[in-house]
Amino acid sequence: YKGQLRTSADQSWAVDASVFTHRDSLYLVWFGIPEQPIPYIFNCIYIARLENPWTLATRPVMIGIPDQRWERHDPEAAFSMGSPQPLKSPDGNLIHLVYSAGGNRPPYSALGLMTAQSGSNLLDPASWKKSPQPVFCQNDTLGVFGPEHCSFIKSPDGTEDYIFYHARYRLEPAANDLRTPRLQKFSWDKKGFPVFGQPIPCHVKQPKPSGTAI
């Protein structure tokens, strides 16, 4: 244990951080409350370069604010985007951040995408471009509701990509106890953007990840 990773002097809200390496530098992304209040905005996405795994080397920079229409659906909550997870394109030319937004409950919650060119300044908000629509939404027909809070892993042999996320099997808005972890394979388009498809219900059998020993 090395100590608390402080993102601000006043220890304000900073949640669901993730790290990634780019051009020999270590970066931290997370979501938190803006230093200066923004009407109807609760959480935004931040980035900073790290001096080491427990110390920021730069001041936090806000790179994402919930300003898309689909991110502002929930009529009973302050607008929020969070849980950013880094994902590099197969050729390394793009750095994606996949994030949760739309409210922390179905039917609004979904995954969005922010993208930067690998040669850009990742600490410049202008480097990040948002997808205008969510990239992973609930599947009403098959009964998968409110997908959010994802991460990414490879198959054992490294040839396949998988998204790991949680979702609900019923539509009750506040039923966090109904959330279950899900795993499914995804692909890439020719431009280096992830193609997640639709959430798959838990009862649907899927092929084992390539290289699985059992």
Where are these regions (language model features)?
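Carbohydrate-active catalytic/glycan-binding domains of CAZyme proteins
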Residues: 1-214
